[in-house]
């Protein structure tokens, strides 16, 4: 029976026919072997091309090993508390490769080496960077730096996760000394958040600023999404809900409508519908009544539809006391529809750093919130201890 020159399966009847052919003509075997080899090599080459194309069309760009060693660090901050995608103290870097493409990455290595566990992300895959205060913080203020995904990666099936890390409101004493941005400069003349935002501007990454014109200095409100408590931050071009996993980032240009619902004497809910997901209304509940005017003003500024009177999303209220005229207008003729606040069964993603919520009992959700709070308090204690150590060193220098 004819055997191909390489591992190449042939139907038995075809192999028998070829065997009969080259028995009749000895030269036929050489020609047939050459044809089989050509078919095998061509098929392998085509398979490799398809595989390479799948890689290009699939996940966001990643750095090759040959380029990793040639990265120039534009700006780095050592030993910062990363919140997302993993809760851990790491080092954050912004750099460029020889082609001029800019990248951002976190690493366990203080020299800026790319860590295999945390691949670098093309900065084009982030649409902006936001600097948000950590709410209800006692002691030294902390700010969360948020790299918001949704740039060139919007059409990619697996866009990058948000990158969130915390920095204290103090001089950037832990900035990486090898940063090109700091050459000839005293790093202590910069506050951490200012240095990071200047670095992002240096690589043309847009900065999302808070809407202080309407909200003043406190541009965030306490809210719930399902059983998950968090804060809604209102920026000039973003609305962000955080900081527990998953972080929600909504570009104002993608917001189709905002409506008010479940208005009570003390609280109200809002429903946000995005143009990219018109069939889904994201509800944020238990917002304090004092923020109604601010949110209404924000809606007017970004010119989105208010569908509070829409039959599909008509506000259901159980007003008990007299409210301002604009709130009464929303609740008109709906006082009889008393609807208690409903919590979604939305679970948070489990991983080694987060304890997911359970829809089975409020106790599990409370326990998760307590663990989250303990982790945040531990981070704050670390910052406070570092600040205390610095003060001791300073006193010794004076002595």
Curated annotation (Swiss-Prot):
**What domain of life is recorded for the organism?**
Eukaryota
- Which Cys residues form disulphide pairs? none
Keyword Nucleus among UniProt keywords:
yes
List locations, semicolon-separated: Nucleus; Chromosome
Spell out the Acidic residues composition-biased ranges: 343-354, 363-399
Q: Which UniProt keywords apply?
A: Chaperone, Chromosome, DNA-binding, Nucleus, Transcription, Transcription regulation
Spell out the molecular function terms from Gene Ontology: DNA binding; histone binding; nucleosome binding
Q: Which SUPFAM superfamilies match?
A: PH domain-like (SSF50729)
Q: Where is this region: Disordered?
A: 331-399
Pull one GO CC term from this UniProt entry.
chromosome
Family under the similarity heading: Belongs to the RTT106 family.
Explain the purpose of this protein.
Histones H3 and H4 chaperone involved in the nucleosome formation and heterochromatin silencing. Required for the deposition of H3K56ac-carrying H3-H4 complex onto newly-replicated DNA. Plays a role in the transcriptional regulation of the cell-cycle dependent histone genes by creating a repressive structure at the core histone gene promoter.
What protein am I looking at? Histone chaperone RTT106
